UniProtKB/Swiss-Prot annotation:
The keyword ATP-binding applies. One of its GO terms (molecular function) is UDP-N-acetylmuramate-L-alanine ligase activity. ATP binds at residues 118-124. Its EC number is 6.3.2.8. The gene is murC. The keyword Repeat does not apply. This is UDP-N-acetylmuramate--L-alanine ligase. GO terms for cellular component: cytoplasm. Its main location: cytoplasm. Belongs to the MurCDEF family. It comes from Clostridium botulinum (strain Kyoto / Type A2).
Length: 458
C-alpha cells in the first residue's frame, strides 16, 4: 500500500494528466481533505480551472520542474514512459502510482465501496445510483466518469463510509479495487488491444467477482450469457436482475412518447413498486434495475429508490438533448461500441422524428478493426448514416483501417451512408438535408458532439 488516506495527510501529491475526468475527481477528493495537490496537463480546461480555484497548483505542459517537492506522483495509463515528469520522478526516487492503484488505495478508507463494472452503461448506472443514494441520505462519496448535474460535476465528497465509483475493465484496472458491492452490467468483446479475446475478458471479470467479500454482494444482469458462465465464481451474496428472469425483474413495461420506460419492479413474483424512467431505451431499464438491486442490498427504502430513479434525467453525453433548430432535434450520445450503438439507435427509433440521421465517429483504430463486422451491422435503425474520420485517442494510424472502409461496407449492405473528413462539411450537409421534424444523433466517444453544437449555434 503506497498511499494511506490517514497517514499521508501531510503529503504533496502530484497528478500527471490532472485534467482527465477520473484524475480530476481524485484530486478534488484530496483537496477536500486538505492534501497539497499539484498537477499537469497538456491543455487548460474548465476542469483544470475548477481545480485551481479549489487550491490545486496547475501546470500546463509536462516539465520535470513541475514535480518539485512532490512526495507521490499519480499518472494515467495514457502517460508515456518518456514523459519528463515520470523520468524525473524515477531519478529522484519519488513514489509513482498509476491511477487505478491509487483509487484502490483510496477505497481502503471506506467500508461500503460500490463498484459498477461492465462493458456498457457504467457511467449512467453510477449516476443513477448516485441519485438513489442521495435521496436515501447516505451521504456518499461519488466518483463518476461523466458530469452529473445533481453533484455539479463528476465528484462528490461525503462524510459516510459509502463510496460509489465506476470500475473499468480496461487494462484490468478494476482488479485493483476493493468492492463491498460489485455490479456487472454486461460483458462484451471490447478493448481487444489489451485483451486477447472474449474469454480473456470473462476471466478478468471472474477475478473481479472474487474481490467481493463473503458478506458483500454481487449484482449481476442474469440474462447475459457471458455473465451466466462466470457467476458461479462468486463467494458472496448474489442478486441477479433481468426482464424475464432474475431475483429482481421488470414487468409490464411500457414506453412513453420519448421512449422512456415505465414498469413494475417484481421480486419473487410479488410487485415491490412501480417506477417511471426519464431516460430512454431498454438498456436504461436494465441500468435502473442494477441501481435498484444495489439500493435494496444497501437497505435503502423503496420510496427513496423510486425518487432517486425518477429524478434522474441522464448525464452529459448519454442521449443528451443538445437542442432544437428549425424543429430539428439534436441529441448526442457517447456510444462507441456496436452493442451501445444498437441500443442508442433503438432508443432513438422510439423518439419522435421523421428521419433519423446518425452521425458517427469511430473511436480508435484497434476497436474499429477488431469489431469491424459488428460495426457493419449496428446501424440498421438509422435512416441515414454520416461517418467522420476515426478518432485516434491514444493510437496511431497504421493505414490498416479507416472510416471510408466502414462506409464502403455499409453502402454494400444497401444503407445510405456518406463519409466526410471535416466537421464543417458534415454540418453543411445537415443544413442542406435535415428537414422539419428530423432527428440528428451524434454518436461516438471522441469529439463528434461538436458537430451538433456547430449545427445548433449557426
Amino acid at each position: 500500500m503506497l498511499f494511506n488516506f490517514i497517514k499521508d495527510k501531510n503529503k504533496h501529491i502530484h497528478f500527471i494528466g490532472i485534467g482527465g475526468i477520473s484524475m480530476s475527481g481524485l484530486a478534488e477528493i484530496l483537496l477536500y481533505h486538505n492534501f497539497t495537490i499539484s498537477g499537469s496537463d497538456m491543455n487548460s480546461s474548465p476542469i483544470t480551472k475548477k481545480l485551481k480555484d479549489k487550491g490545486a497548483h496547475i501546470y500546463i505542459g509536462h516539465k520535470k520542474e513541475n514535480i518539485k517537492d512532490a512526495d507521490l506522483i499519480v499518472y494515467t495509463a495514457a502517460i508515456a514512459s518518456d514523459n519528463p515528469e515520470i523520468i524525473e520522478a524515477k531519478e529522484k526516487n519519488i513514489k509513482l502510482m498509476d491511477r487505478a492503484d491509487f483509487l484502490g488505495d483510496l477505497m481502503k478508507g471506506y467500508k461500503y465501496n460500490i463498484a459498477i463494472s461492465g462493458t456498457h452503461g457504467k457511467t449512467t448506472t453510477t449516476s443513477m445510483l448516485s441519485h438513489v443514494a442521495l435521496k436515501a441520505n447516505v451521504d456518499p462519496t461519488i466518483l463518476v466518469g461523466g458530469n452529473l448535474d445533481i453533484i455539479n460535476g463528476n465528484v462528490r465528497v461525503g462524510k459516510s463510509d459509502f463510496f460509489i465509483t465506476e470500475a473499468c475493465e480496461y487494462k484490468s484496472s478494476f482488479l485493483k479495487f476493493f468492492p463491498y458491492i460489485g455490479a456487472i452490467l454486461n460483458i462484451d468483446a471490447d478493448h481487444l488491444d489489451y485483451y486477447r479475446d472474449l474469454n480473456d475478458i470473462k476471466n478478468a471479470f471472474s477475478k473481479f467477482i472474487k474481490l467481493i467479500p463473503k458478506d458483500g454482494y454481487l449484482v449481476a444482469y442474469g440474462e447475459d450469457k457471458n455473465i451466466q458462465s462466470i457467476i458461479k465464481e462468486a463467494n458472496c451474496n448474489v442478486i441477479t436482475y433481468g426482464i424475464n428472469s432474475g431475483d429482481i425483474q421488470a414487468h409490464n413495461i411500457e414506453y412513453d412518447e420519448k421512449a422512456c420506460g415505465n414498469f413494475d419492479v417484481v421480486k419473487d413474483n410479488q410487485k415491490l413498486f412501480s417506477v417511471k424512467l426519464n431516460v430512454p431505451g431498454k438498456h436504461n431499464i436494465l441500468n435502473s434495475l442494477a441501481s435498484i438491486c444495489i439500493g435494496l442490498a444497501s437497505n435503502m427504502k423503496c420510496k427513496d429508490i423510486i425518487e432517486g430513479i425518477e429524478s434522474f434525467f441522464g448525464t452529459h453525453r448519454r442521449f443528451e438533448l443538445k437542442g432544437c433548430k428549425n424543429n430539428i432535434t439534436v441529441i448526442d450520445d457517447y456510444a462507441h461500441h456496436p452493442t451501445e450503438i444498437s441500443a442508442t439507435l433503438d432508443a432513438a427509433k422510439k423518439y419522435p422524428h421523421n428521419k433519423l440521421f446518425c452521425v458517427f465517429q469511430p473511436h480508435t483504430y484497434s476497436r474499429t478493426l477488431t469489431l469491424f463486422d459488428d460495426f457493419t451491422k449496428c446501424f440498421d435503425n438509422a435512416d441515414e448514416i454520416i461517418l467522420a474520420d476515426i478518432y485516434a485517442a491514444r493510437e496511431k494510424d497504421t493505414g490498416i483501417i479507416s472510416s471510408d472502409m466502414l462506409g464502403d461496407k455499409l453502402r454494400d449492405r444497401g444503407l445510405k451512408c456518406t463519409n466526410f473528413h471535416k466537421f464543417d462539411d458534415i454540418k453543411n450537409y445537415l443544413i442542406e438535408n435535415a428537414k422539419d421534424g428530423d432527428l440528428i444523433l451524434t454518436v461516438g466517444a471522441g469529439d463528434i458532439y461538436k458537430v451538433g453544437e456547430m449545427y445548433i449555434n449557426l
